[in-house]
Amino acid sequence: MDVLTVPQLAIPTAHEAVTLVNAWLHREVGMAVHATTAHFDSTTFCWHLPIELAYATHGTLGVVGDVYLHAATGAFVGRPSAAELIRRAEHLAAACGIDGC
């Protein structure tokens, strides 16, 4: 039996963190919200991803939340619910004069 002697990370790169979070966002929240960057925090061993609301016709309107992923396990360790992100996105869109998300 082979024994794993080199630790493996579930989410080793920023690109993989962004891909995972965007898949969740687009499935649960909608296509207008996305993550474009992920920053690694070595103290918590988590990826931090700001969630932005953007429209092709208006560009990026702003950040509506943050997601935290544990790099070793791949688990979401902090995120607003899908319903909360939708509420925040609708509020920001309305404040910018855009109807609906």
Model segments located where?
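Long, terminal "pre-/pro-" and other extracytoplasmic accessory regions
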Residues: 1-101
